[in-house]
Amino acid sequence: QIDLHNLYGGVVPELAARDHISRLVPLIKNEFEKNDLSFEILDAIAVSKGPGLRGPLLVGNTIANSIAYALKIPVINVHHMEAHLLMPLLDANPPSMPFVSLLVSGGHTLIVKVDEGGRYTIMGETKDDALGEAFDKTAKLLNLGYPGGPEIEKLAKLSQIDRFRFPRPMINSDCLNLSFSGLKTAVLYAVQKLDALSDEDKIDISNSFQNAAVD
């Protein structure tokens, strides 16, 4: 849905939900046909219950429950972030427990310890904005495309200097919590101070922002 949301510099929930409606069933059908599979092989259907955008979640849950009802199989409700946490276990060389995972998205930024038996400990989290949101908002300020992460990274590689030296909130704190709202505001002020936003400015701001965000 990148092309759909690019005009707005971020996800528009209503548009995302409508696009889910038009694409999800054909996508599922195509995947089964492409891999020569039958729906009868399914023993259950797992679906995300959230957290996330209400509209797209509703579409996914409606379709999952409809298919499950037709096949007379159970639906397994999955926590969105827990699913991300456990994805490494599907790798050919999965990590041994306990392991620590960094979850970064447009809505969440968490450092989580994963133990046996579905036990999780949040070691740190953002106290305000998610890192993905900060990247998207910065990209929008610089009139770049969506999603912001790849666009900023591409420009950052062209700069050799930390020209703007943006703040690193909480970097010296004793905890593992994070903060990105101040960084986002610092980028806004830097852009406002410039008479005009040149290509060189975009490159240097992207580099300075990315350096501060990942430090």
What spans do the regions from the language model cover?
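A contiguous, well-structured pocket-lining segment that forms one wall/lid of small-molecule binding clefts
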Residues: K154-D215
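N-terminal beta-alpha supersecondary unit
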Residues: Q1-P51, H80, H84
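Conserved phosphate-binding catalytic cores of ATP/NTP-utilizing and phosphoryl-transfer enzymes
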Residues: N77-V100
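Nucleotide and nucleotide-moiety/phosphate-recognizing core
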Residues: S38-I41, I63-H80, M87
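Glycine-rich phosphate-binding loop plus the immediately following alpha-helix
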Residues: N93, E116-Q160, K184-T185, Y189-L194
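Short glycine-aspartate micro-motif
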Residues: A44-A46, P56, F99-L103
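Short Gly/Thr/Asp-enriched flexible loops that form oxyanion-binding sites at enzyme active sites
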Residues: V47-K72
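Short beta-strand scaffold segments in enzyme catalytic cores
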Residues: S101-L103, T109-K113
